[in-house]
Curated annotation (Swiss-Prot):
This is Pheromone peptide ILME. GO terms for molecular function: pheromone activity. Keywords: Pheromone, Secreted. It comes from Sepia officinalis. One of its GO terms (cellular component) is extracellular region. Has myotropic activity targeting the genital tract. It is found in: Secreted. It comes from the Eukaryota. Follicle, fully grown oocyte and egg(EC2).
Length: 4
């Protein structure tokens, strides 16, 4: 999971 990649979040910004």
């Amino acid at each position: 999971i990649l979040m910004e």
